[in-house]
From Swiss-Prot:
The keyword Repeat does not apply. It catalyses: succinate + ATP + CoA = succinyl-CoA + ADP + phosphate; GTP + succinate + CoA = succinyl-CoA + GDP + phosphate. Mg(2+) binds at residues 199, 213. One of its GO terms (biological process) is tricarboxylic acid cycle. Substrate binds at residues 264, 321-323. Succinyl-CoA synthetase functions in the citric acid cycle (TCA), coupling the hydrolysis of succinyl-CoA to the synthesis of either ATP or GTP and thus represents the only step of substrate-level phosphorylation in the TCA. The beta subunit provides nucleotide specificity of the enzyme and binds the substrate succinate, while the binding sites for coenzyme A and phosphate are found in the alpha subunit. ATP binds at residues 46, 53-55, 99, 102, 107. GO terms for cellular component: cytosol; succinate-CoA ligase complex. Residues 9-244 form the ATP-grasp domain. This is Succinate--CoA ligase [ADP-forming] subunit beta. Keywords: ATP-binding, Ligase, Magnesium, Metal-binding, Nucleotide-binding, Tricarboxylic acid cycle. The lineage of its organism: Bacteria, Pseudomonadati, Pseudomonadota, Gammaproteobacteria, Alteromonadales. One of its GO terms (molecular function) is magnesium ion binding. Binds 1 Mg(2+) ion per subunit. The gene is sucC.
Length: 388
């Protein structure tokens, strides 16, 4: 689960980190009033979406004119912002963040992730702030400095000083950086973060450190113990099909291909996508119905797959272990009848009651293509998607 910038900054403020005074606004009038409450003669207005690249897409504006703030808010509120990190539809803008403007002397980067290799929280800092850190990692990896947090001892001030020295900070800035580092590390564990970024962490013209932006990703598996964070979830930023799938405990990820995939088990689902690719097809989704699939969930999975207009054929690949193949077959038949499937459906069943499942499908009278193996299923569904 991701947070908006204004939500991230509210958490930063709770831990004593330096952030700009700002207000998240729902209307153009609120945005104008927010500028008045902040004071000064220069403000920054930002569209609030769960995607980077807002500035290049026109979603960030610096202005000293309150009427320009009104015009910006009226233009974006209720519309979708398309950036390099979104699909062609973009993400809806429901709030505008109005902040005081900060005079910048230099831009740094500070972030943290859970590193699967070390099984530790790893902090990363760089002098290359304000740009995509992935680009820095690829082109100049020596400019990224790391600190690994030991879960037994927690974050240590010496780690902050080591990073600060590599960033070229002076003694005053070093103290500020240590406070920021310790606060972020504590926050990361307290709230079960999976990702944290301040890009840029700026040095102001007065020589102070300031958190100019904030990006936070939460470990979805830990939300049960984070009610405050869970309440910050903005469902409008989620893919509609993914959100619908989550209601039925289906693991669904939308992709850009034309072969719909319904599989039980994440590993088998990834293998199915690979073999579809191997035979020249492009998966339209990842969908794992899980080991405890019911007829209702299978039917719902079918509806979700077919709600994607790009899907030209569907591959159902089921290995019956916990779940019975005959039950899956009944779910497929029910969904095909209920939804009125107009695209070819290729089914491969193996495992518990596989023969019975194939028999149920054969007697259904529906136009369902039975596959003898996974390779056969992939070949058949790719041909079907191409209209052959």
């Amino acid at each position: 689960m991701n947070l908006h910038e204004y939500q991230a900054k509210s958490l930063f403020a709770e831990y004593g980190l330096p952030v700009s005074e700002g207000f998240a606004c729902d209307t153009a009038q609120e945005a104008v009033e927010a500028a008045g409450r902040i004071g000064g003669n220069l403000w920054v207005v930002k569209c609030q979406v769960h995607a980077g690249g807002r500035g290049k897409a026109g979603g960030v504006k610096v202005t000293g004119d309150k009427e320009e703030i009104r015009a910006f808010a009226e233009h974006w509120l209720g519309k979708n912002l398309v950036t390099y990190q979104t699909d062609e539809k973009g993400q809806p803008v429901a709030k505008i963040l109005v902040e005081s403007c900060t005079d910048i002397a230099n831009e740094l980067y500070l972030g943290a992730v859970v590193d699967r290799a070390t099984r530790r929280v790893v902090f990363m800092a760089s002098t290359e702030g304000g740009v995509e850190i992935e680009k820095v990692a690829e082109e100049t990896p020596e400019l990224i400095h790391k600190a690994i947090i030991d879960p037994l001892t927690g974050p240590q001030p010496y780690q902050a000083r080591d990073l600060g020295f590599k960033l070229g900070l002076n003694p005053t800035q070093m103290k500020q950086f240590t406070k920021i580092f310790m606060g972020l590390a504590t926050m990361f564990v307290d709230h079960d973060f999976a990702l944290l970024e301040i890009n840029p962490l700026v040095i102001t013209t007065e020589g102070n450190l300031h958190c100019l932006d904030g990006k936070i990703g939460i470990d979805g598996n830990a939300l049960f113990r984070q009610p405050k964070i869970k309440a910050m979830h903005d469902p409008s930023q989620d893919d509609a099909r993914e959100a619908h799938a989550a209601m039925f405990e289906l693991n669904y990820v939308a992709l850009d291909g034309n072969v719909g995939c319904m599989v039980n088990g994440a590993g088998l689902a990834m293998g199915t996508m690979d073999i579809v690719n191997l035979h020249g097809g492009k998966p339209a989704n990842f969908l794992d119905v899980g080991g405890g699939a019911t007829k209702e969930r299978v039917a719902e999975a079918f509806k979700i797959i077919l709600s994607d207009s790009n899907v030209k054929a569907v591959l159902v690949n089921i290995f019956g272990g916990i779940v019975r193949c005959d039950m899956i077959a009944e779910g497929i038949i029910g969904a095909v009848k209920e939804v009125g499937v107009k695209v070819p459906v290729v089914v491969r069943l193996e495992g518990t009651n596989a023969e019975l499942g194939r028999e149920v499908l054969a007697k259904s009278g529906l136009d369902i293509i039975a596959a003898n193996s996974l390779t056969d299923a992939a070949e058949q569904v790719v041909k079907a998607a191409e209209g052959k």
